[in-house]
Amino acid sequence: MEKGRIVYLNGVTSAGKTSIVEALQARRDVFFYVVANDLFQETIGEDYLKENYWKYLGEVIIMMYHTAKLFSDLGKNVIIDSILVEREGVAPHYERMKEILRDNPLDLVEVYCPLDICRQRNIDRGDRYETQSEEQAKLMSAGIQYSLRVDPKSRLMRTQTTQPLTIFS
């Protein structure tokens, strides 16, 4: 059985990852399931998150990668809507994710948005705090090998990939 493609959308909150997910899921020529930090975080009780946020979030993020791997192993395409941050519970995050998904077709997509725009989006949304994107940017994993970079100015800029990501055309 051919493995499904995994597309990892990596970026700070309010960069536009979920909007990209919605656009991809609206297409009729390719089908993707979605796993996301926000969805998996909801599996953790609030009291546990208050007690030790990164411990429990770290565990569920790793489970999310195993879930994406399962979809791919079953021949299903899947999008990961997340952010690669280096925090206790997941560090070394980027390396752990690569190890879990090493045998699966993986494209890492940097979803870039200027932090001042993210800040304004956070304010407008009201469900994020104003500086959340800046704080996440400081924690992002370094040295990530992206397949593509998506940003609001140039729409799409290829950096490197073994197979073109035609889903973004």
Protein language model regions, located:
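Glycine-rich phosphate-binding loop used to anchor ATP phosphates in small-molecule kinases
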Residues: 56-103
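Pre-Walker A (Motif I) flank of P-loop NTPase domains
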Residues: 2-6, 76
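P-loop (Walker A) phosphate-binding loop of NTP-binding proteins
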Residues: 12
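Hydrophobic anchor at the beta1->P-loop junction of P-loop NTPases
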Residues: 9
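Conserved substrate/cofactor phosphate-moiety recognition/catalytic segment
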Residues: 15, 19-69, 73
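Conserved beta-strand scaffold positions in the cores of enzyme catalytic domains, especially
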Residues: 32-34, 106-110, 151-155
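Conserved phosphate-donor/acceptor-positioning beta-strand/loop module used by diverse small-molecule
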Residues: 101-121
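Small-molecule kinase domains that catalyze NTP-dependent phosphoryl transfer to phosphate-bearing small molecules
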Residues: 124-168
